[in-house]
């Protein structure tokens, strides 16, 4: 499967999930379908970070769109719940720190010990980044929690597809366990629902590393706020 096909599966899954939440809250199977979205998007956040030519621009694109959606949501719902784009913004920030550490580890050492200082500084930045994310996730409600933030980071740790798939599988399982145990959740039912996210593992295993026939670079960024707006407007009418 190409990246385009998997991203379209994620988009449809997300849309079905949000339709279920807003318009048909009693139709539980819609939520089950929705469990495919987050892990697939998380995998391709890591892929996007891996291939982007401008990581700062990549971060800002996700963060600013997430911030805009967050402001609208917070004003409308009058509660602080950090949405998935802010989750992925934190993922990109941590991946940038990890990437710096990986680069520092590959630089040959010099008599002045510059490599050691660079590795130490990069490791400190990684620790601070992960610690800050953990503090944020412990202080406010973040979509998919700390494990959700770290899922793309896990995927980004290796360039080898089998290793990336293994890391992705571990990350999806961690997200499953964290989400099923969130305060206020009925653990048994929520665990069964979240377990459907494991279906993304064979889907990612089928990923062929190709972009796909059509380049829809910005479509998925536009689709996220657009489908939420349409669903919200429909909810006002019905």
PLM region descriptions:
Residues 1-238:
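Alpha-helical transmembrane segments and their immediate juxtamembrane cytosolic regions
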